[in-house]
Amino acid sequence: MNIIGSDRNTNIGGFMWKFKELIRDKTFRRWALSIILTIPTSVSTFISFLDLDARCRLIILLILVGLSLVIIIVQFIRLLFMNNITLNLNGSEVEIKKGDIFEVPRNNYKVIAFNEYFDTQVDDVIIARETLNGQYIKRYYSHQDITELDQKIKDDVKLKIEEKNVERPFGGKTTRYSLGSVFKDMDFFLVAFSKFDRENRAQLKLNEYASCMLNVWNEINTLHASKEVFIPLLGSGITRHVDSDVGVNELLHIMLWTFQISKVKFREPAKVTILLYKNDHKKINFYKLKEFEKNGL
């Protein structure tokens, strides 16, 4: 596999997508038009009181138009390469940036998505090794420790059980929990996030995704103890969205929208940081996210 070529194609694709999004964005176009009209018009009004001939006035006007275009181009480039943003949502600070959940310092809470059974069997059948929960288990648990973790999850009375003794042809645990249930493990929040279809593929409908995120925010709100919470862009990995073709930009919008309507409050020093994995930040229109501070989705 040509990984370098694949990454290059991803970079170009993300760049072109952002370019088109900015060109089509009505807010940006209105701002650009206001710059072109405001600066030359304001200065032209001022110089109209000066004793200048027509040629000088034309030169000044052209310089001002050129300056306006430079301002617009500089802002366009800045937005095009923007890869992080901090929002104030209902009084809570929410930062969105590229990052690795496993590089977050200890004593900050981190969210890891599991399936609705809280499976811990990393064998590329039940849990794939390259997934975040697969990496989490391999990093922090030996075989003996996993047994202890399984028992702690089983004994947690706060987890809402949906069904017991579920028959699963590919193996795994048999107790199914409510989507959005959160189990606190050290400084990690393990979330029951995805379902399995008959072919053992992680999947989620869009309405289930939104409902799950509402539960996640409310659960985290009772557990974070005024600490910063780092959460990956949930659903951007191997989870299939069976009733819609949504990308990472749409998933991020849903995460922010559910955060807003949940009315969860993270007061200083607590805040939420949404981490974008690998090249996901290239598929996000950060400029558009500012609208959440005004009116949400």
UniProtKB/Swiss-Prot annotation:
The protein's location, in the record's own words, is: Cell membrane
The UniProt transmembrane annotation reads 32-52, 57-77
Q: What UniProt keywords are attached to this protein's entry?
A: Antiviral defense, Cell membrane, Membrane, Transmembrane, Transmembrane helix
Please describe what happens when the gene is knocked out. Answer: When this gene is missing the Thoeris system does not confer phage resistance in B.subtilis.
A Pfam family that this protein carries is ThsA_Macro
Biological function: Probable membrane protein component of the Thoeris antiviral defense system, composed of ThsA and ThsB. Expression of ThsA and ThsB in B.subtilis (strain BEST7003) confers resistance to phages SBSphiC, SBSphiJ and SPO1. Activation by a signal generated by ThsB leads to phage resistance.
Which named protein is this? Thoeris protein ThsA
Tell me what gene encodes this: thsA
